[in-house]
Amino acid sequence: DARLLASLGAGLLLSFALPFVAFGLLRVMTNLNRLDAAAVAAHYGSISIVTFVAASSVLEGRMVDAEGYMVTVAAAMEAPAILSALWLVARVAPDDERMDATLLREILLNGSIVLLVGSFAIGTITGQDGLDDISSFIVAPFLGVLCLFLLDMGLVAGRGLRAVRGQLSFGTVAFAMLTPLVGSTLGLGFGLLIGLWAGGVALLMVLSASASYIAVPAAMRVALPEANPSIYLTLSLGVTFP
């Protein structure tokens, strides 16, 4: 299906490009240092699967049709943003260290990337029958585990809120509110260009507008431990997500 391939291509391109857009906005609008700006930018290129699920439920409730393969686009948009973020991290590393070969290996073999791509491949191979076999272990407890994870993320953001209050300037909060509008506008343009249904366009806008608070925080804690997690979690989870 040409439209499926075009949708995947658009999703990959948006996920690769949005961290660079976010990084540029952060450098102009905020006083964050380059390392924290790179870590924050990573979150705004990746996606929030919870927001995607919520948007899908809203569309279904309003009987607005969307392409079934948009969940595939969502899965494809997780990894590229992490790749872009890790590249940004390397470019802003202290002392301008050059780690081209090492960096490439680190990016391609990053644990989050391997798990995401590997899970996608396994799901493609096993299909619905494979999911049915393990649904009681994977599907049933998903929302409960996710709630616990979000509670933990909220605690982390809450504990760090006082510490980063001086850094969460008007510009920083404005960035967290403006960037989703930029992303959704780009998603709207690509969706209309591809010719997606109204629901598909809406979901691509949601994917482009959302900020990650699951996959990317875990990756940033490993790739950029010097960055302040309270900043990027507070912005993505406390400002953008609501």
Regions inferred by a protein language model and the residue ranges of each:
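Alpha-helical transmembrane segments of multi-pass small-molecule/ion transporters
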Residues: A2-M153, G158, R165-L168, M177-P242
